[in-house]
Amino acid sequence: MNQEYLDFELPIAELEAKIEALRAASDDKVDLTDEIKRLQKKSNELTKKTFANLDAWQVSRMARHPNRPYTLDYIEYIFTEFEELAGDRAFADDKAIVGGLARLDGRPVMVIGHQKGRTVKDKVSRNFGMPAPEGYRKALRLMEMAERFKLPIITFIDTPGAYPGIGAEERGQAEAIARNLREMAQLTVPVICTVIGEGGSGGALAIGVGDKVNMLQYSTYSVISPEGCASILWKSAEKASTAAEVMGLTASRLKELNLIDNIVQEPLGGAHRNYAKIAENLKLRLKEDLAELDGLSKEELLNRRYERLMSYGYC
């Protein structure tokens, strides 16, 4: 996969281009190893400096990075024996939501998540990660299956929001989201939710009610996009950077507000720079969360989940 850089990463991109050019020019007659090492060190230092001071708008753009790992990527790296399950048994199979049975270090679990696309065709097929009601009903069907078989549920959140099209509204988008919120609050199995990219409004919440809610370092979670907020408050999407700052949508800010439990650190430069490393970090987090939740009874799980939901809005 070709590395793509955001505008604030352009100085890093220039250094990386020079490094690649030197590697291509290096041969048995011309040894450029020392110069390559010098530039690599400079690139790493610049990357550390750049990513140590990202503002909320830059984090928002990182959360949408086109090379960022999606749900199926994490499934490939973290789980084994994944068996995808399709359809809501009522209308259709929504490819913006994927899910199925898998094993986490041998332990059976149910995995569910939003899925965006890479190619143009795949993006259209996945509806850019925006589920319709049938997607949320599929997710609920899999959660109910997990409940019957006493399987922990692991969800990955990455969506701009639920699809707002006329057809989706006619098929009961609001009802599907509301039902998921209610049913997830009553599940008697452990539920671990992780925001891996964009956590957009009710479309994210519909698979986001859990005993543990984690966020990747450069993910976001908010009731509206910065552009949408800016369009409402300032009548201009150009104020998106200002909106992002006041919305408190970053993992660090949400952790301060006790709205999430943990922040999963990303590799230097973001999750898209090293799929294996971010998957390793996330897998460790999931295993630690499961180990903690395994020690709780059904009543304790439900009481803690209820207390968590009732605490929202209080600092």
Swiss-Prot record:
> What Pfam families does the entry give?
ACCA (PF03255)
The protein's UniProt keywords, in alphabetical order, are: ATP-binding, Cytoplasm, Fatty acid biosynthesis, Fatty acid metabolism, Lipid biosynthesis, Lipid metabolism, Nucleotide-binding, Transferase
Q: Look up the EC number in the record and give it.
A: 2.1.3.15
Q: What class of enzyme is it?
A: transferase
Q: Name one GO biological process term.
A: malonyl-CoA biosynthetic process
Per the record, the pathway is:
Lipid metabolism; malonyl-CoA biosynthesis; malonyl-CoA from acetyl-CoA: step 1/1
Q: Which reaction does it catalyse?
A: N(6)-carboxybiotinyl-L-lysyl-[protein] + acetyl-CoA = N(6)-biotinyl-L-lysyl-[protein] + malonyl-CoA
Q: Name one GO cellular component term.
A: acetyl-CoA carboxylase complex
Record flagged with keyword Lipoprotein: no
Principal subcellular localization = cytoplasm
As for what it does, the entry says: Component of the acetyl coenzyme A carboxylase (ACC) complex. First, biotin carboxylase catalyzes the carboxylation of biotin on its carrier protein (BCCP) and then the CO(2) group is transferred by the carboxyltransferase to acetyl-CoA to form malonyl-CoA.
Xref: NCBIfam families:
accA, AccA_sub, PRK05724.1
HAMAP family per record: AcetylCoA_CT_alpha (MF_00823)
Tell me which family the UniProt entry assigns to this protein: Belongs to the AccA family.
Q: What is the name listed in the Swiss-Prot or TrEMBL entry for this protein? A: Acetyl-coenzyme A carboxylase carboxyl transferase subunit alpha
Taxonomic lineage: Bacteria, Pseudomonadati, Pseudomonadota, Gammaproteobacteria, Pasteurellales
- Quote the gene name from the UniProt entry: accA
